[in-house]
From Swiss-Prot:
Protein name per the record: Ribosome-binding factor A
SUPFAM superfamilies, per database record: Ribosome-binding factor A, RbfA
Function in brief: One of several proteins that assist in the late maturation steps of the functional core of the 30S ribosomal subunit. Associates with free 30S ribosomal subunits (but not with 30S subunits that are part of 70S ribosomes or polysomes). Required for efficient processing of 16S rRNA. May interact with the 5'-terminal helix region of 16S rRNA.
Acidic residues: bias regions: 140-167
Main localization of the protein described in the UniProt heading: cytoplasm
Keywords, alphabetical: Cytoplasm, Ribosome biogenesis
Phylogenetic classification of the source organism: Bacteria, Bacillati, Actinomycetota, Actinomycetes, Micrococcales
Region (Disordered): 122-167
InterPro entries to which the protein is assigned, alphabetical: KH_dom-like_a/b, RbfA, RbfA_dom_sf, Ribosome-bd_factorA_CS
GO biological process: maturation of SSU-rRNA
Family to which the UniProt record says this protein belongs: Belongs to the RbfA family.
Complex and partners: Monomer. Binds 30S ribosomal subunits, but not 50S ribosomal subunits or 70S ribosomes.
Subcellular location, record wording: Cytoplasm
GO molecular function per UniProt: ribosomal small subunit binding
């Protein structure tokens, strides 16, 4: 079993080889709009999954999937020529869902922005539930002019304390 670092390097190499082979070796016009986005290889280096996106509608995506299945043998042969492993991995092509997920995320962000604007409009026209200034200042009778509390009136016995507050 190969280490994961070797599998990752091999996956990147397979991604490049398949992308180049789609442009050079495969003459099918249905593969012109295919972009290889990622490749993953199992740790035993026997199976490679290649993720791709297709520029176009659902019909173009279905046509591209059929074209990739048809060209799978040519692409595997090209991968076998360009990588240095004992056994050429089998290839599996999977349509990548990143563009769909990205458009869904953009729609969610637009919806959140619209809701934030509604909340901001409601907040601008909102009024306080109680008085306008709920944090009133102290009334004049609550303010004590001296720093002493009323309980600390017996200070006569403190004169005979020394520096360390001992008697």
């Amino acid at each position: 079993m190969a280490d994961p670092a070797r599998a990752a390097k091999l996956a990147q190499r397979i991604k490049v080889v398949v992308a180049e082979a789609l442009g050079r070796r495969v003459k099918d016009p249905r593969v012109e709009s295919i972009t290889v986005t990622d490749a993953r290889v199992t740790n035993d280096l026997q199976h490679a999954t290649i993720y791709y996106t297709v520029f176009g509608d659902d019909v173009a995506q279905a046509d591209a999937a059929r074209a990739l299945e048809k060209a799978k043998g040519v692409l595997r042969q090209e991968v076998g020529r360009n990588i240095t492993v004992r056994l050429t991995p089998t290839l599996e092509f999977v349509a990548d869902q990143i563009p769909v997920n990205a458009s869904n995320l953009e729609e969610l962000l637009r919806e959140a922005k619209r809701r934030d604007a509604e909340v901001a409009a409601l907040a601008a026209s909102a009024k306080h539930a109680g008085e306008a200034d709920p944090y009133k200042g102290d009334s004049p009778e609550d303010i004590d002019e001296d720093d002493f509390d009323e309980e600390d009136t017996d200070l006569s016995g403190d004169n005979d304390l020394d520096e360390d507050a001992n008697r």
